[in-house]
Amino acid sequence: MTAATQFDQVSIIKRANVYFDGKCVSHTVVFPDGSRKTLGVILPGALNFGTDAAELMEVQAGQCRIRLEGSEDWKTYGAGESFSVPGNSRFDIDVVETLDYVCSYL
């Protein structure tokens, strides 16, 4: 079984979500059932993100290291891998190679 390479029958919010002075840029995709995902790119560097809802981050290309709030351990993720972040939390991300990602809100 292969992963889907596109999303069909969706709406895209035209205005970009721009964070950290342009180091992270994404667009919101709205599905027919009202659920949302963001598709984005994070440039190399170290950032700290906060979450409202739980998230599943799927790495499409690039490489990063992640440290979840309350942990001292860093984990490395690359293309084809994913990681989960709890809701109402924070995580550190160290982008080693420009990151292309899909974020699903759980």
Swiss-Prot record:
It is an enzyme of class 2 (transferase). It catalyses: a purine D-ribonucleoside + phosphate = a purine nucleobase + alpha-D-ribose 1-phosphate; adenosine + phosphate = alpha-D-ribose 1-phosphate + adenine; cytidine + phosphate = cytosine + alpha-D-ribose 1-phosphate; guanosine + phosphate = alpha-D-ribose 1-phosphate + guanine. The keyword Transmembrane does not apply. It comes from the Bacteria. Coiled coil: none annotated. Its EC number is 2.4.2.1, 2.4.2.2. One of its GO terms (cellular component) is cytosol. Keywords: Glycosyltransferase, Transferase. GO terms for molecular function: guanosine phosphorylase activity; purine-nucleoside phosphorylase activity; thymidine phosphorylase activity; uridine phosphorylase activity. Belongs to the nucleoside phosphorylase PpnP family. HAMAP family: Nucleos_phosphorylase_PpnP (MF_01537). Catalyzes the phosphorolysis of diverse nucleosides, yielding D-ribose 1-phosphate and the respective free bases. Can use uridine, adenosine, guanosine, cytidine, thymidine, inosine and xanthosine as substrates. Also catalyzes the reverse reactions. This is Pyrimidine/purine nucleoside phosphorylase. It comes from Paraburkholderia xenovorans (strain LB400).
